[in-house]
């Protein structure tokens, strides 16, 4: 399926020398926290959310998004439903509809954080001040630091199918502070998927965009609007990876596999302010 992702943002912001964001001291080493997280399956792995997450081949990851040295465990799954007339073995248009059906209609997210004493697993809250659009955390791409409120924040893109062949691409900003994940939807791009008898594809055709206040604009205007949102923040060298379904199922069937999967995943997490190159 052809889909034009939004271009990476090029932000010019000065890096500042700071201590770990959040200011909290880590009482427990990351290694011990990882072991603790793996042992807490009774907390994160027994309810309906987890069963649906397994069935939908979701993703999970170990992070420290707020920089308080208390590790987080996030679960993300995509919710999908059929598109009328879809048939992955039919004609090209029917195959195109089957491709569109792979686009989620919404996401489901859940997160936990190790307590300061390392003895409890606390479920994170999600707050939506704009629109209740659960974010696709697997698309977290850029990290920033706001010196004003000493908060790390991240940009993500959440693509949802709307009705049969429509879509919305939500431009979102994510931050975590004091146990709450703040999800701000600062812009939305609207469009539809075009189908063709000549080829088994579905092409994303953008219609218009609007900012968080409902002001309509073109795609480039929205990109500039999103860029301006982070103009006063310091960019970070940010990286994280997700544990996919196949690896997760293998880990579950291996002694110590979940802890090892968590440990390997944590090694991929990186957050460091970029040097000022001016």
State each model region's role:
Residues 2-10:
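Bacterial N-terminal signal peptides that target proteins for export
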Residues 58, 105-109, 167-169, 181:
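Repetitive beta-architecture junctions, highlighting loop-to-beta-strand starts
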Residues 26, 32, 137-278:
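Acidic, small-residue rich beta-repeat scaffolds with periodic aromatic anchors
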Residues 27-31, 84-126, 172-177:
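Beta-propeller blade repeat segments, especially FG-GAP/WD-type strand-to-loop junctions
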Residues 46-58, 128-144:
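Repeat-based blade/solenoid architectures
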